[in-house]
From Swiss-Prot:
Keywords: Cell shape, Cell wall biogenesis/degradation, Isomerase, Peptidoglycan synthesis. Belongs to the aspartate/glutamate racemases family. The lineage of its organism: Bacteria, Pseudomonadati, Pseudomonadota, Betaproteobacteria, Burkholderiales. One of its GO terms (molecular function) is glutamate racemase activity. This is Glutamate racemase. The active site is at 76 (proton donor/acceptor), 186 (proton donor/acceptor). Pfam families: Asp_Glu_race.
Length: 277
């Protein structure tokens, strides 16, 4: 096994939502070391111009490659939609993106009405338009931007009256239109599953693509002979903003109490990250 295979996989999101993907990767690929980076200083990406999203995503991913990551998982639907092709052109490591799980939703739906809850940027992207055209078939697809949800989740708020009020506004019209399946089209939204269940009960089957992304990563690493062996180190957690929300979310989601590190990734070259003790 090469030293390169023992290098970490970088997992990147605009904020904390990608922790749902990191959890799935740890379950599927326990030997892989993971470096999680939350660009929380600039979250949420979903309300920013496409040019900013693409440029910022490339800058952060260049930095992760500079830290020695052997592969990257873009655990952010918005960043994937706006930048994944650019990343694959510019970076010399495998890049795995995420996209709304519309294909499994269409296969699952019995009513042939599917809801998609995602950021406005994802829903407006050419990548999503192509996905919709390719897989929707005879399904009616109801697309709803999740305005206001990501900032609440970034603060650790996943079940407050404010969250429930927004979710009711977004989900009740889908239910009234006959939707029986809901695509969680942002990696933040799996944290809302309990709140969604409170509103919809068992009327909606929820589609979360975290484990599909993890399996795709595993296949990609195997094809490139980059699979790690042995016991992985604990994940490292980095943020471009206050680390306390990241630490709190990791504790709640993974049952761990990590010491996250704050970093600065500007528009110009930055020094390498200090070695982790």
């Amino acid at each position: 096994m090469t030293t390169r295979a023992q290098a970490p996989v970088g997992v990147f999101d605009s904020g904390l939502g990608g922790l749902s993907v990191l959890r799935a990767i740890r379950a599927e690929l326990p030997a892989e070391s993971l470096l999680y980076l939350a660009d929380s200083r600039h979250a949420p990406y979903g309300e920013k111009p496409p040019e900013f999203i693409a440029g910022r995503t490339l800058r952060v991913c260049e930095w992760l490659v500079g830290q020695g990551c052997k592969a990257l998982v873009i655990a952010c639907n918005t960043a994937t939609a706006q930048a994944v092709h650019l990343l694959r052109e510019q970076l010399a490591v495998p890049v795995i993106g995420v996209e709304p799980g519309l294909k499994p939703a269409v296969a699952t739906s019995r009513s042939r009405v599917v809801g998609v809850l995602a950021t406005e940027s994802t829903l407006r992207s050419d990548k999503f338009a192509r996905l919709l055209g390719n897989v929707s078939g005879d399904c009616r697809v109801l697309c709803q931007p999740g305005y206001g949800l990501v900032p609440l989740i970034e603060r650790g708020d996943t079940h407050s009256p404010a969250v429930l009020e927004l979710l009711r506004a977004y989900l009740l019209p889908m239910l009234e239109a006959g939707a029986d399946t809901l695509v969680l089209g942002c990696t933040h939204y799996p944290f809302l599953q309990d709140a969604i269940r409170e509103i919809a009960g068992d009327r909606l089957t929820l589609i979360d693509t975290g484990h599909a992304v993890a399996r795709h990563l595993g296949r990609t690493l195997a094809a490139a002979h980059l699979q790690a062996t042995g016991a992985a180190a604990s994940p490292r957690f980095l943020s471009t903003a206050d680390v306390l929300p990241l630490q709190a979310m990791v504790a709640a989601l993974l049952g761990e109490a990590p010491m996250a590190q704050r970093i600065d990734i500007g528009d110009t070259a930055v020094p390498p990250l200090a070695s982790h003790q």
